From Swiss-Prot:
One of its GO terms (molecular function) is phosphorelay sensor kinase activity. The keyword Iron does not apply. Pfam families: HATPase_c, HisKA. Member of the two-component regulatory system DltS/DltR. Regulates the expression of the dlt operon. Probably phosphorylates DltR. It comes from Streptococcus agalactiae serotype III (strain NEM316). The lineage of its organism: Bacteria, Bacillati, Bacillota, Bacilli, Lactobacillales. Residues 177-387 form the Histidine kinase domain. Keywords: ATP-binding, Cell membrane, Kinase, Membrane, Nucleotide-binding, Phosphoprotein, Transferase, Transmembrane, Transmembrane helix, Two-component regulatory system. This is Sensor protein DltS. The modification Phosphohistidine is found at residue 180. GO terms for biological process: cellular response to phosphate starvation. Its EC number is 2.7.13.3.
Length: 395
């Protein structure tokens, strides 16, 4: 996670630098271009007015005269263009008239005489272009500069992300240690209460204590699961799995639970959808999603469960009728211990279940998302199918 955070920092830093540099380069280039054209126009205007080159020989200027019969005579040509190109271009420039001073790569000035003859001074700006070798050198130095900036950004990211990494590591360690420490006393409380239940049967206070200790045990187990999932170096047993079979096994268990809740669980499962993953974690995803759908669906409703293979992915979808949730609720559905603050969902709380499901899916290089279609809440999981994985993708 912290490696990804450092990469995002470098990417964001480099993106901002590149945008700023490109903007400054564009502004500087446009500024220089404007003054180059302005200086060039002053020169050609002076040449055309005096009817004489009268400037150093390295300036890329051609001086031509055109008589009243439109016959072109080249007085001098100090450009890289041929005389034929100069002649044709001169006639084109004459058509443009005095109002314009630029045509294509030419800056020009026209002096008209009373006998309808013309003197045209032409400067070819293309001759000012940076040579290819120099351009290539500039490109190499630019790339080298950006690579150097990327290396510096990566180095600095350690100091920026480091404190966050330290604090989060301490937090995870605290959660893990606290969860382990709480397991023993809670188990002892539950055992003692069960003994009391045998001695005082039917006591609703003892029943409530047993129920709450069970809930605490599940919560602690969820916290430990999240702690293990956050630690990417923890060992997992990835292998080839028939997701279709796993779905059928889990559905068989939850069909009776749905029936008890007076809800109907319908499934459409495509045969032989294979993935690579850790079997217990994949089952945990299915259990979390089905449990969530049954608990949060409306009474006497139908829950749709489907599995198919498309676009080199296994696509698992669970939808159920539900209240209409706000965008804020949908955006935070996978946040840990998210408590909805919504008029239609004032008692909605998802705990850690969906957070664990998201962590497992991401560990399997997949994607999970939630969206609503009218009164249907739909959860969709996408996992890479077998054959799309490589060994290097497995942590």
């Amino acid at each position: 996670m912290f490696s990804d955070l450092r990469k995002k920092f470098v990417f964001l830093t480099m993106s901002i630098l590149i945008v700023v540099v490109l903007f400054l380069f564009a502004v500087s280039n446009r500024y220089n271009q404007y003054w180059d054209e302005y200086d060039a126009y002053r020169i050609v205007k002076l040449v055309a007015k005096n009817d004489y080159l009268g400037i150093p020989g390295d300036e890329p200027i051609a001086l031509v005269t055109i008589d009243n019969q439109k016959m072109v005579k080249i007085q001098s040509n100090n450009t890289d263009l041929t005389n034929d190109v100069i002649e044709k271009s001169s006639l084109k420039l004459l058509e443009q008239g005095k109002k314009s001073r630029k045509w294509k790569s030419f800056i020009y000035s026209i002096k008209e005489y009373k006998d309808k003859t013309y003197t045209i001074a032409i400067m070819d700006l293309a001759s000012y272009e940076v040579p290819y070798a120099r351009r290539f050198l500039i490109l190499v130095f630019t790339i080298f500069g950006f690579c150097l900036l990327a290396a510096v950004s990566l180095y600095l990211s350690r100091f920026i992300v480091g404190p966050v990494e330290t604090e989060m590591t301490r937090e995870k360690q605290f959660v893990s240690d606290a969860s382990h420490e709480l397991k023993t006393p809670i188990a002892a409380i539950r055992a003692n209460v069960q003994v009391l239940e045998q001695q005082i049967p039917g006591n609703r206070y003892l029943d409530h204590v047993v129920s709450e200790t069970k809930r605490m045990e599940f919560l602690i187990e969820d916290l430990l699961n999240l702690s293990r999932l956050d630690e990417k170096r923890s060992k997992v047993n990835f292998k080839k799995l028939n997701l279709s079979v796993l779905c059928q096994e889990v559905l068989l268990t939850y069909e009776s639970l749905a029936y008890e809740e007076e809800k109907c669980l319908n499934d459409t499962i495509e045969d032989d959808v294979w993935i690579v993953g850790e079997e217990s974690q994949i089952k945990q995803i299915l259990i979390i999603l089905l449990d969530n759908a049954i608990r949060h669906s409306l009474s006497k409703s139908e829950i749709q469960f489907s599995l198919k293979q498309a676009r080199r992915k296994a696509i698992l979808t669970i939808s159920n009728p539900s209240a209409i949730y706000s965008k804020e609720v949908m955006d935070n559905l996978f946040e840990r211990f998210y408590q909805a603050k919504d008029d239609h969902a004032d008692s909605l709380s998802f705990g850690l279940g969906l957070s664990i499901a998201k962590a497992i899916v991401e560990r399997h290089k997949g994607r999970i998302r939630a969206y609503q279609e009218k009164d249907q809440l739909r959860l969709e999981v996408q996992l890479p199918i077998d054959g799309f994985w490589t060994n290097t993708m497995i942590n």
